[in-house]
């Protein structure tokens, strides 16, 4: 005969098993609307004025990103004066930003009301493309900062890094970017853990967003430290040079030119990335904050960084600017065909600015 305690404990055990099963349940077959509704993120049913504005502006920026970065890659390929490690990294940066343009272009046609048509797999693919492209861009910026740091402190115009090492660096950059973009698709998501879903990215886990945000912030801090170290080093050199030479104006111009470049690089990164990174942290740490109202605009702001990189790193170079004009005008001159006398003087303006102060200081002291 079944006792009363056994009779009561049996349904309790069944309830606990049901609860455990529900906690481990996965929702791969659910619609995107299911995740959006659960996270509280509004999913548009029709195109409104804001959605049309964001889409139109986004497509325009995407086209500019792809054309501008394609121009950079072609310029570096056709001009032999750019066949140095720093320019190969700049070409890879342009490739990463070109890929970012493609990723955003795909996003623009799969956002707004079109999001409802996506499956779980295609939604993760859409976000993964963006994560991969942005990670590649940031990693390239870091690689360029490291290369500049090594070049300045070794007092060289170009690093002696072999082409094989440059290829290894590029492969590492893209490997890291692809892994970072693929992590949510291979399991680090909230499809089986709905309680920890993000509000901004309803299929992403809060823990992954924190990890991705910290990864980018640490990269940003490393870049700041590297450029700050370069600036302090060059400033000390130029101050010594001003005491041992008769060209203080040149010294001051050298230091100010470097400062301007550093401010542009870091300023663009801060303006374009910081709001989005802060928004991701607020999404996890401040659930009551109304962050979704600013999401699309901060996404566009981050997208602008890929459009600004060709201008910052390439267009300030006079040789690069001249090559742009020759390509756009379908001209072919000896400057593009191969190196000529004075080609070293046409190198990167940042290289020339830094090394002008460093080498002049060495000669004046000696």
From Swiss-Prot:
Cytoplasmic side: 78-85, 147-165, 228-257, 318-366
A matching Pfam family: 7tm_1
SMART domains: 7TM_GPCR_Srsx
Keyword tags: Cell membrane, Disulfide bond, Endosome, G-protein coupled receptor, Glycoprotein, Membrane, Receptor, Transducer, Transmembrane, Transmembrane helix
Binding site for a 1-acyl-sn-glycero-3-phosphate: 41, 126-131, 212
GO molecular function list: lysophosphatidic acid receptor activity
PROSITE patterns reported in the protein's UniProt record: G_PROTEIN_RECEP_F1_1, G_PROTEIN_RECEP_F1_2
Domain of life, per lineage: Eukaryota
Glycosylated residue positions: 29, 37
Keyword Disulfide bond found: yes
Gene Ontology annotations for the cellular component aspect, listed alphabetically: cell surface; cytoplasm; endosome; plasma membrane
CDD domains tied to this protein: 7tmA_LPAR1_Edg2 (cd15344)
Protein purpose: Receptor for lysophosphatidic acid (LPA). Plays a role in the reorganization of the actin cytoskeleton, cell migration, differentiation and proliferation, and thereby contributes to the responses to tissue damage and infectious agents. Activates downstream signaling cascades via the G(i)/G(o), G(12)/G(13), and G(q) families of heteromeric G proteins. Signaling inhibits adenylyl cyclase activity and decreases cellular cAMP levels. Signaling triggers an increase of cytoplasmic Ca(2+) levels.
Name this protein carries in UniProt: Lysophosphatidic acid receptor 1-B
């Amino acid at each position: 005969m079944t006792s009363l305690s056994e009779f009561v404990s049996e349904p309790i055990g069944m309830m606990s098993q049901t609860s455990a099963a529900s906690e481990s349940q996965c929702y791969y077959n659910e619609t995107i609307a299911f995740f959006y509704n659960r996270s509280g993120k509004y999913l548009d049913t029709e195109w409104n004025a804001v959605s049309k504005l964001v889409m139109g502006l986004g497509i325009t920026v995407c086209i500019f990103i792809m054309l501008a970065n394609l121009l950079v890659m072609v310029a570096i390929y056709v001009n032999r004066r750019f066949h140095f490690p720093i320019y190969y990294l700049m070409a890879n940066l342009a490739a990463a930003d070109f890929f970012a343009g493609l990723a955003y272009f795909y996003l623009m046609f799969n956002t707004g009301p079109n999001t409802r048509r996506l499956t779980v797999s295609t939604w993760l693919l859409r976000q993964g493309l963006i994560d991969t492209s942005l990670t590649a861009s940031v990693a390239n910026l870091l690689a360029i900062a490291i290369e500049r740091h090594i070049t300045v402190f070794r007092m060289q115009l170009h690093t002696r890094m072999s082409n094989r090492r440059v290829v290894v660096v590029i492969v590492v950059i893209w490997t890291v970017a692809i892994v970072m973009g693929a992590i949510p698709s291979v399991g680090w998501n909230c499809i089986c853990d709905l309680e920890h879903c993000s509000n901004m990215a309803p299929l992403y886990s809060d823990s992954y967003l924190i990890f991705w945000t910290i990864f980018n912030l640490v990269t940003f801090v490393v870049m700041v430290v590297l450029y700050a170290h370069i600036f302090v080093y060059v400033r000390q050199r130029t101050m010594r040079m001003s005491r041992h030479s008769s060209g203080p104006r040149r010294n001051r111009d050298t230091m100010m030119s470097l400062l301007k470049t550093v401010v542009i690089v870091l300023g663009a990164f801060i303006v374009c990335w910081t709001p989005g990174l802060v928004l991701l942290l607020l999404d996890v740490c401040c659930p009551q904050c109304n962050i979704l109202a600013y999401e699309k605009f901060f996404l566009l702001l981050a997208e602008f960084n890929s459009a600004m990189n060709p201008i910052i790193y390439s267009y300030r170079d006079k040789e690069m600017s001249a090559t742009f004009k020759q390509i756009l005008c379908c001209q072919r001159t000896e400057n593009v065909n191969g190196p000529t006398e004075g080609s070293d003087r046409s190198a990167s303006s940042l290289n020339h600015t830094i090394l002008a102060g460093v080498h002049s200081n060495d000669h004046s002291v000696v």
